[in-house]
Amino acid sequence: SHPMIARALSTLLAACALLATQAQGTYQIAVMKYNGGGDWYANPTAVPNLVKFCNDQLGMDINPDVPNVDVGSPDIFTYPWLDVTGHGNITFSPQEAENLRNYLIGGGFLHVSDNYGIDKFLRPAMKTVFPELDFVELPFAHPVYHQKFDFPHGLPKIHYHDGLPAQGFGLIWQGRLVCFYDYQCDLGDGWEDHDVHNDPPEKHIAALQMGA
């Protein structure tokens, strides 16, 4: 049917756009803007600090400019990684949900950092993107914890929140992790400038290492 062909073409174009961006040799991370009233703009120093850490410590070629991009915009296909945070409500229109789905199916990646309070809004919002998927807790043996820096016990605990253990959840599409969600952890706060939260240096470094 025409809608199925259109969706297939959209996914193909998304994959091509991401591959073209990656072939240029300079990656760029963006902060994803969403509707619903939640503070998508929280932690303004977080992602720039992560980018600087990756470039300085790992020699990665990430563009230091971190733009904000609307979830419903075709511009999201320019960025291989989108970062999301906030404390409050998240809503996606049908067009926004389809756009984000095509982005993720086409090769994009979404990181969500629980800035304390986002959980009850994030889960139903992502259900509009992937109705067929549920967030699953990733085991400590998952490769996400064993990249450039090793985290044998999973996510580091950065902020207290409810005093619960930090957990990493994922949405897995056809065997590929398309969304990683840090819960009761707050990596984003850990990436921020020291004078924002006054986190101990070891917490700041652990958060950056996990992000990298």
Task: Name each model-derived stretch.
Residues S1-P3:
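Short, Lys/Arg-enriched N-terminal segments with co-localized hydrophobic residues
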Residues R7-A20:
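Bacterial N-terminal signal peptides
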Residues T21-W81, T85-G88, D186-L187, D193-A212:
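Aromatic-Pro/Gly-enriched surface loop or interdomain linker
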Residues G25-Y27, F77-L82, I105-L110, L133, ...:
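Loop/turn elements at helix/coil->beta-strand transitions in domains of secreted/extracellular proteins
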Residues I29, W81-F121:
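Short alpha-beta junction capping motif
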Residues M32-N35, G72, V84-H87, G106, ...:
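Active-site-proximal beta-strand/loop segments in catalytic clefts of secreted hydrolases
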Residues G36-G37, T45, D119-G211:
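An acidic, glycine-rich "communication" segment
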Residues P64-V71, S93-N99, G163-Q167:
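Alpha-helical scaffolding within the catalytic cores
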